[in-house]
Amino acid sequence: MNQQLTVTKRNGRKETIDLEKIHRVITWAAEGLHNVSVSQVELKAHIQFYDGITTTDIHETIIKSAADLISEETPDYQYLAARLSVFHLRKKAYGEYEPPALYDHVAKLVDMGKYDSHLMEDYTKAEFEELDAYIDHKRDLNFSYAAVKQLEGKYFVQNRVTKEIYESAQFLYILVAACLFGKYPKSTRLDYIKRFYDASSTFKISLPTPIMSGVRTPTRQFSSCVLIECGDSLDSINATASSIVRYVSQRAGIGINAGRIRALGSEIRNGEAFHTGCIPFYKYFQTAVKCCSQGGVRGGAATVFYPLWHGEVQSLLVLKNNRGVEENRVRHMDYGVQLNKLMYSRLVQGGNISLFSPSDVPGLYDAFFENQERFEALYVKYENDPSVKRETVKAVELFSLLMQERASTGRIYIQNVDHCNTHSPFDSEVAPVRQSNLCLEIALPTKPLSNVEDDEGEIALCTLSAFNLGAINELDDLAELSELVVRALDALLDYQDYPLPAARKSTMNRRTLGVGVINYAYYLAKNGVKYSDGSANGLTHRTFEAIQYHLLKASVELAKEQGRCPSFHETNYAKGLLPIDTYKKDIDSVCEEPLHYDWDTLREEIMEHGLRNSTLTALMPSETSSQISNATNGIEPPRGYVSVKASKDGILKQVVPDFLNLKDNYELLWNIGTNDGYLHLVGIMQKFVDQAISANTNYDPSVYDSGKVPMKQLLKDLLTAYKYGVKTLYYHNTRDGAKDDQGDAVQVPEEDCEGGGCKI
């Protein structure tokens, strides 16, 4: 009966459906794949055909039929579905499967205003032809289905209203490289472009959403993370809100430091008025964050930071929970609570914590970040001064409230500000780190603005990327990859536009980069080691030592060629201090691996030539971009062998890499047991990583007799993280018993970092 059905062609003509042609396309897509059945895909699709069906609907039906068959037993359907999608998308973009010549493609899209016109000005036709001959369009067939759907939904240059798509993946990769290396000398730039194209299109380097979707278009803002500090004045609060709007509209995730704002009831103008407290201003920031969608890709998101000893802390800790009324809740932002050794020692010793308004205790707020001994002396002095207004709470009660809110919302984060400043690339006396970003992996200096155009203030930006550990055969491969990624991201800093002077000045002076990793869980499985039992400690130490060493080396080489960053003198590197000198020595008790690289020679080179970049590493979450590389997310263990991600492009199934061979080696999140092994690994990584790490804590209430996670356990893990030098804690995940056991882990999309922000 199917023979009689008609199909409506793209040009509107009707003809009899050609099942043989459909068979040929599916057979082509199945070539070389393991355990997939062409006839099963055909059968599943045929049932859904109807008379007059359009060519597009036929294609989409076949793709969906293949995607529905993805499972643990038959993981290769993810490649069959992907190849069918690639075929379909190329037809949509080019009218045929074969891509056009690169030069013609770029000329057309520049003419349409979709690509940046500098591409036609910077490169000759002959150069485009040389690059075109180098492109390998067959690499499109290495994507998984989840990757193609992400490319289609988020990354390809398109008209988001009419859903027209204008390009395919290999053009995306080569043009990102061409934009970044456009100002390099003609004699070397094509070589860099080809090498960077190879590294990114074979998934060795993973690029963040803002770069993948934005570089080659006329909108030039690609920093994933923006850190804005607010002062304790109305002018500064207004400047902060305006800065938020400016950056949220350009695809960035925001970290806001609101810790200086004075507490409720504090005096204003010597008592002429009393202060309304933090909450009305947090609401103002929330409105600013939510007023724009991020470049049409997703809604804005922010994390707000404040110290545990802030006078209003008990009202601030509950802002996200579901109790309370609209007036005393600000639920649509996340919060980062700042701690240090003095706060922890009050907890351990069963003491009290005194809460102050920062405006009542001169010098205390700055000392909290700049100098721990000075902070403690001032804190005790103010506690003993009866003229200073304060509230006293039992440390255990305050910490319990903090951990209870972290557990119930999952989104109250932790920043250990002493670790962020003692084990930092920056000299804390001149450039203290006073906040983090949306996802807690960035630790950069900021200064409050007095108005939006103020260039005395400092807005920190971080430009991200990651190494795919699963695609690296030996650690020395990192030497070339580090050179490529440092050169590309450093060039990006000069290539992009800066909406605000405070951001431009800070970035030009510090030139901060954050290179992380993806596919760590696959890397452990491939090497036969686990999160939980310490077997991965040595490998992790060797790997992260190599990453930091090669990135620093690449930045020194670039400094020799293009000069050190102007604020190099504000770094600890300028004093000859390296991460291996300042890390928390407690970590040596869980990992005895020696250093394998020549750090002393590197130290001398840095002292002599400086660094091009003040920071080089940050370990970010990578939900979206790890799907492109078919990798596991960041440093996280997978929740299931098949993850089912709900996104606006429908349900995406993704199977962990090399599942059939490594099934027994993967350790799933809820099989790990305690957080100890994971936190030890994060501590080992943090020894080398110069910024911070988005590290999560995970709890399964069903393993405890009461069915609840004891407070004692939550506090123990918090102290373990502190002990081993962990700078920040991101999500608190609680197992809710949803489908995890069946190997399929269903993940709902997150409203914040989903798709970029300061994830990659």
Indicate where each model-derived feature is located.
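A glycine-rich phosphate-binding loop feature that marks nucleotide/adenosyl-phosphate handling sites
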Residues: 44-45, 63-65, 79-87, 199, ...
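Core nucleic-acid recognition elements
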Residues: 1-3, 13, 36-174, 178, ...
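Catalytic alpha/beta core of large soluble enzyme barrels
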Residues: 124-150, 440-446, 489, 493-494, ...
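Function-dense linear segments that define catalytic or interfacial modules
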Residues: 157, 171-189, 193, 197-223, ...
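Gly/Pro-rich turn-and-neighbor structural signature
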Residues: 164-235, 375-405, 409-414, 544-604
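Terminal amphipathic helices with adjacent charged low-complexity linkers/tails
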Residues: 77-110, 149, 339, 420-450, ...
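Polar, glycine-rich mid-to-C-terminal structural blocks
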Residues: 318, 327, 331-409
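Internal maturation/activation junctions in enzymes
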Residues: 482-504, 508, 529-622, 693-694
